[in-house]
Amino acid sequence: MVLRNPDKKGIASALDERSGEIFRRIVESYLESGEPLGSRNLSRLLPISLSPASVRNVMSDLEDLGLIYSPHVSAGRLPTQTGLRFFVDAFMQVGNLSPEERASIERQVGPGNRDHSVENLLTEASQMLSGMSRGAGLVITTKSDPVLKHVEFIRLAPTKALAVLVGEHDQVENRIIELPAGITSAQLTEAANFVNAHLAGQTIPELRTQLEKVKETVRGELDALSQDLVERGLAIWSGSEGDGQPARLIVRGRANLLEGLEGTEDIERLRMLFDDLEKKDSLIEILNLAESGPGVRIFIGSENKLFSLSGSSLIVAPYRDSDDRIVGAVGVIGPTRLNYSRIVPMVDYTAQLMSRMSR
């Protein structure tokens, strides 16, 4: 498991044991309650005897370093985004999942789930991460290359037909193609039978590599009109775009992000976040973030442009297929005061299970 570790040596060298302890307490209090922590309450939490005045002096130094700030006059202190990043990199202890938590995840997205359909696993993973993290669970899956099981040509008009492609897992894709003039229903059936006999069990990319070879076979076995139909169908299928790009985003637990929002401005920022998530470019961006390093990645607030307006954090990890290709990502989106140390192992273990189930 690898976390993002920017160079914070300058900040680290400026903190002694006492200031580090005070900083850690401020951040942990924020992650737990979301409220500023004042010097008087903080002095009571410290394992060493320190007056509120001495605590305030240390707080002032931490403010100068850009690690904490005061939301308003005479308030306590909250961590800045820089402070949160420094805490995650320098102070956070990533916890271990309990046996009960591992078993719960396995029941929903592992071998313990009796419904192993891709759709069910993706939905269950997103729902499970949402429930355990109190954030929004997300799963991104890349567009797969379905293996062709069956093809049928259905006439829609004298010059148009619907080509129905059925994959090995019974997924269905429909394409409208232009028919050669004068082709009969019998020839439609003949063309479909040819495709099913010669191309079943192959993916579209595999079809691309042997398109010319298939055309030669067509010319040897079919009449001219049926040949024309098969070649038109092959041209449409092999010209499909977008293979390997993120095709789907599943998000569960959006309502969790509404908790603690204050005013229409916060709600509008959240709306913009979910609008952005629905855009294909955003899916590619999230997948790229997951691919940018091994293991779990943490992005806080404006560290990523996708979350700069909403002030959200993302914890994300990729999962892989049997060829070790990244085929998707799982993660949690939430406020910057997410329980990072608890969520990181959840995301990490879920990604491991998704990789096993994708092999």
Curated annotation (Swiss-Prot):
One of its GO terms (molecular function) is DNA binding. InterPro entries: GAF-like_dom_sf, HrcA, HrcA_C, WH-like_DNA-bd_sf, WH_DNA-bd_sf, WHTH_transcript_rep_HrcA_IDD. Coiled coil: none annotated. Gene3D superfamilies: 3.30.450.40, Heat-inducible transcription repressor hrca homolog, domain 3, Winged helix-like DNA-binding domain superfamily/Winged helix DNA-binding domain. GO terms for biological process: negative regulation of DNA-templated transcription. SUPFAM superfamilies: GAF domain-like, Winged helix' DNA-binding domain. Signal peptide: none annotated. It comes from the Bacteria. Keywords: Repressor, Stress response, Transcription, Transcription regulation. Disulfide bonds: none annotated. Negative regulator of class I heat shock genes (grpE-dnaK-dnaJ and groELS operons). Prevents heat-shock induction of these operons. Belongs to the HrcA family. This is Heat-inducible transcription repressor HrcA. It comes from Sinorhizobium medicae (strain WSM419) (Ensifer medicae). The gene is hrcA.
